[in-house]
From Swiss-Prot:
It is a single-pass membrane protein. GO terms for molecular function: ATP binding; ubiquitin conjugating enzyme activity. Its EC number is 2.3.2.23. Keywords: ATP-binding, Coiled coil, Membrane, Nucleotide-binding, Transferase, Transmembrane, Transmembrane helix, Ubl conjugation pathway. The chain crosses the membrane at residues 20-40. The keyword Coiled coil applies. Its main location: membrane. This is Probable ubiquitin-conjugating enzyme E2 R521. It is found in: Membrane. Pfam families: UQ_con.
Amino acid sequence: MHDYLGSFYNPLTLQKKLKYIHHIIINYITNSILYFFLIMQSKNNPKHNSMKFKEQTESPILNQSKLVNTLDIIKDEINKWEEKNTDKDIKIVSIDNGKIVLSMVYGKQHIIEILCPKDYPNVKSGFSCKEIKTVNTIPLSFISQANNQLKSKKNLSVHRIISHLSTTFQNYKKALKSKVSKDKMKDKSESNSEHEQESKSVVSNEIPSEVSIDSKLTKDINFINDLIKEANKCSNDVPSDSDETHQEVDDRPLTEEVVVPDPTRIVRRRNSKLQTGSTKIKIFGKSKNSGPSSSKTSISSMSKVEELEDKNPYLQEQDIMSIIQDEWNKVQESKSICPTTNEDNNDLDNLINEVERLVQETKDQETKDQETKDQKEIWASSLTIEEPNGENFEEFSWEVPNETSQITVVEPVQEATEEPVQNVTEELIQLVADEPVQETVKDSVQEVAEESVQETTVEAVQEIAEESVQQVVEESVQETTVEPVQEVAEEAVQQVVEESVQETTVEPVQEVAEEPVQQEVAEEPVQQEVAEEPVQQEVAEEPVQEVAEEPVQKATEELVQQEVAEDIVKLDVTVQNDFSDHSDSPEPSDSSDSEEEITNSNNLGRYFKIYDPTTGKTTGVYVGKTPTQAANKAFIKTFSNDNTGNKKEFYLQEYTGNKPGKIYKYEGTRQKLNQPQKISIPLYGDGQYKTITYNYKNTVVKKNVPDSIKNPPKTIKKSIKPVKKSIKPVKKLSTTKLDSQTNSVKEKSENKDIINYNDTGDKYGLYIDFGKFFKNSKIPFDLEKLRDNALKLSNQENQDDNYSTMKLRNFKNNNAVNLMINDFTKLYNDGVKNGYNIEPVNNNIYDLDILLSSNFLDKDSVLYQDMINLKIDHIKINIKINHKMYPFYPPQVSLIRPTIENNVAAIIATIDYLFANKWNPMISIVNIVNDIRNILNKYGALDEKKYQNNLDPIFHDLVELSLLTGTQCSMYQSDQKVIDLSNNSTNEKQSKYWKKGTGFGHSGLSDWDFNQTKENIKNRELKIYQCLRKIVVKLTKIILGKNQVDVINILKESCFIPYLKLVFIDGSLFDLVKDLSYFELVLNSMRILTKEYLPLFLHKYNDKSLLEVLDQFNKDCHSYLNTLKNIKESDCQNEIDIIENFMSFYKRLSTSIEKFNEITESNNKEEVISNDVKDLYKITLGNEVFQEYNLDLNKFANMLTNDTKKEGLIHKDALKAISRELLSHSKNLPVEYGSSIYYRYSPENIRYHEFIITGPEDSPYDSGCFHFRMYNPSAYPNTSPFVSMTTTGHGSVRFNPNLYADGKVCLSILGTWRGQAGESWIPGVSSMLQVMISIQSLVLISEPYFNEPGYESSRGTDKGNKLSTEYNQKVRFNCMKWAMIDVIKNPVPGFESMIKKHFSIKAPHIKQVCQTWINEAPDNNKSEYQKLYDELIGLLDSLVA
């Protein structure tokens, strides 16, 4: 057997030792992985994670509000950072329960986790950050450095931590890029030097196995060879023939025999040791001087290592390397004498290859470690942090400890990290440069090119060319040019020609006579000239109606279709001062004998330009007489050939040559504009006319007029007589005669030239464009681009939008955008006229800036003079429109600048119809701008010292709170009609013969969606909570920061105090304890106010101050705490705590107000009792409405039969619900002279209740007292209470179809009758108060007969009225007997005082009512009525006495 401890270069020995080293490395890696998992397991243990452990043990109910507040504050700070962040490589991934996850991308993604302290922002220390390790990603070293700094710093915030991490990451990227460029230059120089050395080196031929490799690889191999030789030395002194030793070496774990340091440490040490060495090393395959080393030396060196290991199991790198270096030096001193064979050489080559593989693996690990070291080197000196002084601090930055700086900045690292850093950085740069850029370019370019261009070009062209154009050519043009000419030439035209020629010219000219005739007959200006004489008008009407009726209708229909497609909507725009500043000359064209070319607009006489405000173009020219009205008033010109009634408003501007004049309103259709026109225009002062032919798009007709029209027969002039006889033949024209005349005209003109539309630029004759004569005032916006942006915005899903979209389900996005484009066009045209401009913000028509100039205001207003004096160009208003809800939801209007006095900004933002429940969809943006003008004229004024100040952000939050809660702080009431969108008109039309809620006759009718309503209320409350929270945060910053903001006046003029009154009056404690977080937020909004804000609590809004409201609420809190005395503290401790906090706050507030020297004490109030009996009744019986009383529970025995848990204790949830409702009863029960509800409950057992309802006026129950008992079952409030009536004449009287003689009350809310879902009992919503109000208003009514099922159909009939009267007479009699006399004689226990006061004060009214009942009673019952009346009078007199 070959000796195991043979020569160092023995192949077998080397293989074993190589396996030995390989085994050491594998064991090291395995132990490292095991150690890593042990660490992770310890970190995941909840006992070692204090934050997670505490979160699990704490009660979620107690921490719910804190978590919500903490999460909201963190989100606000992150939103601030995102607004300023410009680095796209840094993004927020998630936010969850104080954990923030960041993503930093530079070639590869780094996931950073930031943990906030539990009580943040109250606690601003204890932050931590770490990088989540991912595969093939080298961690960022500055993250661990930052984590060390976070643990020792105080007064930190999420915003600052994220900001500095992002700044550090940006610096890291810059430094890494600069380092890469330097390394590349350095590598080039080293490669050149190495190439020169290689050319000079000579390899010895005496060593055939010598291998030349890369310098760095050679260093690695030599270093491993050193390690192998050291291991060989340790084993040379052991005898080879010892079986025990040999067995021990083979069987024992190799890791126990020799201690080998971490390979990564060895490589790093090798780098430093070989830094100054040569770049080329020879590897010897054989050596004559090689031999075994001294056994004593090997044993001593091995013992040194083992001795150190025993003392310190974690050997330091320096100690191990020093031992290895010493032993290596000793080995070099001794020469090997054992020659090697060829087999040894081959084995050595294999060994070298294996060593190279191991070195490469070590090299990869070295690269990662070195890059981490480079990061530390880059940021070791640049990252510093300054400890903030106290609470006021600005910024901080990371600081690297001194020890870390000394370790990371090592000179030998430079050479070793040259090549690895290059490889890593090159890959990083390529990823960043290649992938994101290509994706962005492809997506954006292709979408824009494909979508916008193709859609617009295809749709617009096809619709105009195919549908509307062809029909007009076939029907309208040909028929009108053939048929009307014949009739006019024979009869109708004769009279017209005579009048027109005589009036217009002294010497008739054929050309002048011909063309007006053709125009007047076919296009109908005839009425204007002939209107003065009745005979001529009659003659002209009939032929036009008979001949031109059908063609005109067809043409009009087609044009209307085209107009809808082209023009979005009819505009109601008033007249501008001028349509154009100058006019252009038309293009020259050919002319004939009967027409003259227009070469200069100055040659034109007096005429009118027709302007269409919808399209923004001039559509024609009109020539005619100016009306007799004043020149500055609008007049209407109607085309007589428009029989369809489809009219449209245009404007006429008078021109003389090219000089514009006055403007008139014009109404008509485009029918007239679809034909070429020959117009006579008077020239300057010479009494002559010039005839011009206009066609569409400024093209003059080139063809000659037919001879039959140019040279009319002489009989035309001779036969013109203004005699009525000529009218008769016109009316009696037969169709056959008309056909023959038409055929003859066609034959005559068959071979002659006529006016041909194909000769013009627009062959179909759809448009007349006089753009060369006039300047078009087009809208200076790209409407197509605005439309595309609006469509994209409308198609996006908005998850923050929680408003109901029920009315928009059938309203398509395209229609909504078209509607908005219309309003935008209207707004622009109105602004041109009234002196304001509009600017879409980022080409978004749903976000508009309105710039109001001084001309927008009345010149006698204060604000107008202030703008002139202070040289203010405009007032900026912003209008934001909800793109998903428009026009069914109001826009948001805000004043941007300047600051205007008298709280104008709040008035503008809270105009009455801008509230959601008062919005009218018919109100346009133009209406809103007009109301803004009225507000500015009435209230606007500027303070030269304050007008440049910007509005504080808290102002906008207060406006939002006003709009959400409906608390209007504005003194302005708009003239616009405000409507209720609750479909009241529809409900009135339904034929209902019963009172809603009684439980009868609802089969087949529509029902309201309770779940949808509940969801809407929930969303609204959430928005209110978020808005109020922002106000509290900003108000706290203003108060603590002592900012120079007049917050007191802002709060006084806003809805803040009215809203708090609304919360504590209408909301009451019953609603507030349902949401403790909201209750606490409202309480905090008052607790943060200092003594300077005390006048706000004393200011009276609607005759009541906030202090008075809080005083009553404080009493309710005392009462509520008393009702909870039977409940364990743990069951409702949160409610008790928040109520006690309020009571403590109110105590401090009242104490501060007592010391306030500017107010009077609230106790010095004078109680004024009105002489009016109604006020006396309310004041006297106000204290009788709600009282405690020890009720006789035995009388409720018949109501307990239906309770499943009669003898069991009441559930704590039911007790809490009843306690809350009792608070509501104390302030919400009605006490009125007409009808009241008086309530008693047992303080010992609040499940038992009694109440009396006094009968409403004008009913058969008037002023009677009706007694009820109510019991809350064990399942309350999930089920309705049990109600029974006791005023039944001892079970003999039924007062109402819903009130039975046995005491049963039939109502759908009580589950005793079927009803709609919204009328049934709804847990958590319905209450005992609702039950009592339902009985008062829906059962005790004026006509109870119709509450009977089946009788409602007879309402309004004679029979039904008669039966109802008879039923009421019985009810009146029983009301006197049992609800008045019996109650006075036998008052209900607990209501004695109330009954006496009630009948005493209402005695005169009761006597009068009962006397009326007697008079209306039937004769056979009057005596019985009289007996009851006499007895009642005696009882009433005794009470009054």
